[in-house]
A protein has these predicted regions:
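Signal peptide-directed secreted proteins
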Residues: 1-2, 26
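Bacterial N-terminal signal peptides that target proteins for export
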Residues: 3-13
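Secreted/extracellular ectodomain signature
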Residues: 26-150
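Bacterial N-terminal signal peptides
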Residues: 13-21
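Short hotspots in intrinsically disordered terminal tails
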Residues: 2-3, 147
Length: 150
């Protein structure tokens, strides 16, 4: 009898803890403007599409906070003079237009090291982060950002 009562108490405590935890996550996500991290790791398949998605996102919801995190081949959209391979559209003007609307673009420093790239190869005002993958995870988990991968 005592074991059954103890199990019920533990279950009630667990349910209460879950309710409190989910309640705080829900209220954090619902307060303030929407926050979104766009994750780009391949310029060829996600670059132009991602930049257009972000433009459309802001056209519909201009108050949205957007951070674009790039790593691996995704950093190519931030390189000076880089163009979309399919139709030769230059990325820099598109990135610049989005930056003027408040979008932050971050490049993974691990990728720079692995690809022997230098910070001066990137367009002006590029922000850098020690690890793109860690940054995406932190924005989602710690800062409540929604995740979009174009």
């Amino acid at each position: 009898m005592k074991v059954v009562a103890m199990k019920k108490i533990i279950q009630l405590i667990f349910v209460a803890m879950l309710a409190i935890g989910f309640g705080s996550i829900t209220s954090a996500q619902m307060s303030g403007p929407t926050k979104v991290v766009y994750h780009i790791d391949d310029a060829e398949t996600q670059g132009l599409k991602g930049l257009r998605n972000i433009r459309n996102h802001l056209d519909v919801s201009p108050q949205t906070t957007i951070i674009v995190v790039t790593h691996a081949n995704g950093v190519d959209i931030m390189m000076d003079g880089a163009k979309d391979k399919k139709n030769s559209v230059e990325y820099a003007p598109l990135v610049g237009a989005l930056k003027s609307r408040g979008v932050r673009f971050e490049v993974c420093e691990i990728t720079l090291k692995n690809r022997n790239l230098k910070k001066d190869q990137f367009i002006l005002d590029t922000d850098f982060t020690p690890s793109g993958v860690v940054r995406v995870a932190d924005l989602q988990y710690k800062d409540g950002f929604a995740y979009i991968k174009p």
